[in-house]
Regions:
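Amphipathic alpha-helical packing segments from all-alpha helical-bundle domains
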Residues: 62-65, 69, 94, 112-136, ...
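Helix-turn-helix
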Residues: 9, 13-51, 55
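A secondary-structure capping/hinge motif
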Residues: 50-52, 105, 114
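N-terminal positioning helix adjacent to the helix-turn-helix/winged-helix DNA-binding module
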Residues: 5-6, 13, 145
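Short helix-capping/turn signature of helix-turn-helix
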Residues: 46, 104-111
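Hydrophobic alpha-helical connector segments
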Residues: 55, 69-98, 149
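Hydrophobic alpha-helical segments that form the core
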Residues: 104-107, 141-162, 175-178
Length: 180
């Protein structure tokens, strides 16, 4: 296995485990085991758990970029917003099981630290993209609309996870998509 392959596997394992259990409940040993990499190799690539967390944040930022690039291929902002909501509905199983991976990171990084600022930028990227869609629709209060929609999505994810019922999330995303 190449060094870049080991690093990639460690990041992917951390992404999965942070989503499933959270940052604080996941040890570096857990990550090494999931990645099938010796524990000592973790320290070769990441000097601290914070360094690994930053790599996870960068991976999540890349995922957000990929999502918004794909959504931007739709012709109108209304279509893009609907497709965003249908994307969430399509992934209802994972959100119901683990919650929103970005939301979970933000909740864990709730203290004023450099890491909390870094993870907040992930939601900031989503919020900025949503705001741009509402602005293109001509909404005078595009920021407020974006905050409202993101809050509705996060609330629906939380309820689906709480009640272990993905149909709640799917139904709410479909309702919101029809309202756009």
């Amino acid at each position: 296995m190449t060094t870049s392959e080991k690093r990639r596997r460690l990041i992917e394992a951390a992404v999965d485990l942070f989503t499933e259990h959270g940052i604080h409940a996941t040890s570096l040993a857990d990550i090494a085991k999931r990645a099938d990499v010796p524990l000592g190799n973790v320290y070769y690539y990441f000097k601290t758990k914070d360094d690994l967390a930053r790599a996870v944040f960068a991976h999540r930022a890349w995922e957000i970029d990929q999502l918004t690039e794909n959504l931007d291929r739709y012709a109108s902002p209304a279509e893009r917003l609907r497709e965003f909501l249908l994307f969430v509905a399509h992934h209802a199983d994972g959100y119901t099981r683990n919650g929103c991976p970005i939301g979970r990171l933000c909740q864990e990084m709730n203290m004023a630290t450099p890491l909390s600022d870094e993870v907040a930028r992930l939601f900031g990227a989503v919020l900025t993209w949503l705001e741009g869609q509402f602005r293109q629709l001509g909404a005078a209060d595009s920021r407020r609309q974006a905050v409202h929609l993101l809050g509705a999505v996060q609330g629906a994810i939380l309820l689906a996870k709480t009640f272990r019922d993905e149909s709640l999330l799917k139904a709410e995303m479909e309702r919101l998509a029809q309202a756009v």
